[in-house]
Every structure is written in structure tokens, then in C-alpha cells.
């Protein structure tokens, strides 16, 4: 059982150093959205017991951070083209949707009225869950959409405007695609990287272990809901600060998969017999 933080504080630390480059800021923002959505999912799966104020505070922070990224992008001398304009509009849509999510979370009522409690009325928990689900739906596609916008914007920026640090060597197309899927919030791991998933597809985890050894990605234990009903939480794989820098220098390269591709860039692993943990 976890104690709810102060109503003015978000669910987790969102005050990371602000990068001077728009691409890095967008990559970091996508990571915050993925983390926020995971926290709501855990609540919906009965794996968290924080009050709605903390979730609303996180959503408010994300809304402000998104508008901040939009301002940073608009300050760049980008060509006035349809792809760039669409990328900015996409970011504005995310900010507006997050504002709606904030309202749902802010109006959620966590306390069961005494009268209803005495009568055994199950409604309050159900109504609270509905508010959480509606808020979750509004931010569901935020992280992938931000990565799409970051990719488009990176294509139109000079190379030295992608990152505030020197390029990380060795980011080939396969590793870059893995980092993109991590940035989208699509990658989970189980049993210390022995098994990894891009969304619901089992994949070989060797590349992920290599990236973790190079401090480009990290696992956040028990931070993502299991794909199996009633299963224990999985570890979400997230970009580190070094991983954000590395991807910011490589995100503009052509990718072998599209934004809406159903299959991951990672090679599928051989299908083993299911273990007890996955039943």
C-alpha cells in the first residue's frame, strides 16, 4: 500500500534537466508520457493505491511540458513545410488532450460517501475507474506521436541541433530501431531481460541487454502491467539520458519500420513453452 504524495506533486520526478535541443526535449517528453500512462495502467490493474490528485498533478506537468516543447520547436528556423506544420499541430493536439485528461483526473472522487458505504454501494470505485480510464485513453498515443513529431523535426534541423553532446558511435539501424521502440514506450522486460516484448510480441532480448550494458536503456522494475490477466507487473525499458542523446543523433535516419508497423524491429525469438508466470 503506497501513500499518496502531496496533491501538488506528480507521481514521479518530472524535473529532469531541460535539454537545449528540441529533439532531446521531445524524446524526454515522450518518456514522461509513457511513464505516466504506465502508472495509470497499474492503478487500473489494482497495482497502485495513490489518490487521483497525484495523477492529476502529473498530467498538469505534462501539459505544461508539451507547450514548452512546442515553444522550443517554434523558435527554430525550420522550413515552412506541411510535414513540419503537421508535427507542430500533432504536439498541440497532445497538449489539448492532456488538458482533458487533467480535468478527468482532477474531478475524480476517491472517497466513498458514508451513506453509500453503509448501503454497500459499489458505484464510487467504478466511477473513479471510469475517470482514470477516460484520462488514460486521452494520452494513450502521446509517446508514439511525440516520437513521430521528433523524427519529422529532426529531418529538418541541422545535425548540430539534434543533440547537446557528441554523437554516440555504433548506433546502427537495428540498434536505432530498438531505441525508437523504447522511446515509444513499447518495450517491456521480464526475468532480468531474459524475455523482452515490443507491445505483445516476444522478441530476442540480446540487443536490449547490450544497450543496457552501454547505459543507453534502463529497466524500471514492476512499472508496467503484465500482458497476462492477473500477472505480476513487468519491467518497462526506458531511455537513459545517454540513450536520449544517442537517439537524438540517429533518429533522423531512415527506419526499417513505420510508425504504425505491427511488428518490431527486433528479431523474434524462438517460441518456448509457456512458463507458469505467463499462464
Which residue ranges define each predicted feature?
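Long, low-complexity, charged/polar intrinsically disordered regions in eukaryotic proteins
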Residues: 124-168
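A short, conserved structural fragment
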Residues: 212-227
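Leu/Val/Ala/Ile-rich N-terminal alpha-helices, chiefly Sec-type signal peptides and the beginnings
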Residues: 1-68
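Long, low-complexity or tandemly repetitive, helically biased scaffold regions used
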Residues: 38, 42-129
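Short amphipathic alpha-helical interface segments
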Residues: 161-213
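Short, amphipathic alpha-helical interaction segments positioned at domain boundaries
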Residues: 230-271
